[in-house]
A protein has these predicted regions:
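Extracytoplasmic/periplasmic substrate-recognition and gating elements
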Residues: 38-40, 63-64, 68, 94, ...
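A local structural motif
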Residues: 68-78, 172-176, 251-264, 295-300
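Short helix-initiation/N-cap motifs at beta->coil->alpha
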Residues: 78-87, 106, 179-186, 261-275
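Hinge/lid segment of periplasmic solute-binding proteins
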Residues: 106-161, 185, 212, 241, ...
Length: 354
């Protein structure tokens, strides 16, 4: 058992700190221009399919803007998240990033910043008058911890929480939603005892497991553990809340609380499983609220926040918020046309989301 825990810890550590090789050569990215030096195309890279929100928004914005300007646009889409990260890293390594690209706030955005590939969008928002119109929580989430600048444009304002099936909780004799992780595991066992899958998870998408690994240190330390971990001043071995998170993931996985074969189930499939009627609990969020609407209105599902880590001092905040998959603008190709597009996006982005 100790060996399995060690393997899990090492796997999670590897996922958090996978080495990111940055390109060392001269910048080779350039805007698509005609012989007379005028831009002819805007390029984009998105972690999307044609049915996802971010693609539909940027396809709408780019189509209308480019039609006005008489230029073309091209959106490269990669659906699988890990494949997308690999593709984005390849562009970073070779300094050939497209004009705009989806980029998570964290290791990959830092890799972009390390090669000076990101436009300071905070300064651009100050210039075009939209700085005060951005939601403060979103701006805080995306603000760079090192220099205080804003390099990513938000996808939106989202919150995350646990959805649960009320009928299964009632059938299992669970009268209240769990407020601690100990209660969470007890409820999982009660669901298993009646032959139901306690928790649905998209285990092949590493971020899903990482959520469970991070819940305890987040509730107890806020951002302190992850920043300390990245700086090399903290570790799973030293931090009790983080150690609790490792044990939690181990218990949920080895006690059969996740669905069979969870490690090969992606997030989309997990979503379809839960909202299709399988499983008692699913970690979801406001980005999927449309899927939950009918079941919620019918009184079939409810939600609860991230539980407390028992016997530790937890912060009051128990609903994570984030800005989605941010958009970066390539500094090397940020010409007058791209600046005009950024202003156009600021003006029309919210209207397109409504």
């Amino acid at each position: 058992m100790r060996k399995m825990k060690k393997v899990l810890s090492l796997a999670m550590t590897a996922a958090m700190t996978a080495s990111l090789l940055t390109g060392m050569g001269a910048v080779t990215a350039s805007a698509k221009k005609s012989d007379d030096g005028k831009r002819t195309k805007i390029t984009a890279l998105l972690n999307s399919t044609e049915s996802t929100e971010q693609y539909q928004v940027y396809d709408y914005l780019l189509k209308n803007f480019c039609d006005e300007k008489g230029i073309d646009y091209e959106i490269e889409m990669v659906n699988d998240k890990q494949d997308y990260f690999t593709k984005l890293q390849m562009y970073i390594n070779s300094d050939t990033l497209p004009d705009i690209f989806g980029c998570p706030n964290g290791t990959l955005s830092k890799a972009c910043k390390d090669i000076d590939a990101l436009v300071d969008l905070g300064a651009e928002l100050d210039r075009n008058g939209y700085a005060d119109k951005m939601n403060g929580a979103v701006r805080d989430f995306l603000t760079d911890a090192d220099d205080g600048n804003l390099y990513l444009f938000p996808q939106g304002l989202y919150c995350e929480f646990f959805m649960y099936r009320k009928d299964l909780f009632e059938k299992a004799g669970i009268k209240e939603t769990p407020t601690t992780w100990k209660e969470f595991e007890e409820d999982c066992q009660k669901l298993a005892d009646i032959g139901e899958i306690p928790v649905i998870i998209g285990g092949s998408d590493v971020w899903q497991i990482m959520r469970y690994l991070s819940f305890s240190p987040w509730r107890v330390t806020g951002p302190e553990f992850i920043t300390g971990y990245q700086a090399g001043t903290d570790s799973f071995a030293k931090n009790e809340a983080a150690k609790y998170g490792v044990n939690l993931v181990y218990d949920l996985g080895t006690k059969g609380y996740f669905e069979p074969g969870f490690a090969s189930v992606d997030y989309t499939s997990a979503t379809n499983l839960f909202y299709g009627g399988t499983g008692g609990i699913f970690y979801s969020g406001s980005g999927q609220i449309n899927l939950a609407e009918d079941m919620y209105d019918a009184g079939q599902i409810g939600f609860f926040p991230v539980p407390d880590t028992e016997e530790m001092d937890n912060m009051e905040t128990n609903i994570p918020i984030h800005a989605g998959f941010g958009i970066g603008y390539n500094k090397a190709t940020y010409d007058d046309t791209m600046q005009e597009f950024f202003d156009y996006a600021c003006e029309h982005y919210s209207a397109r989301l409504i």
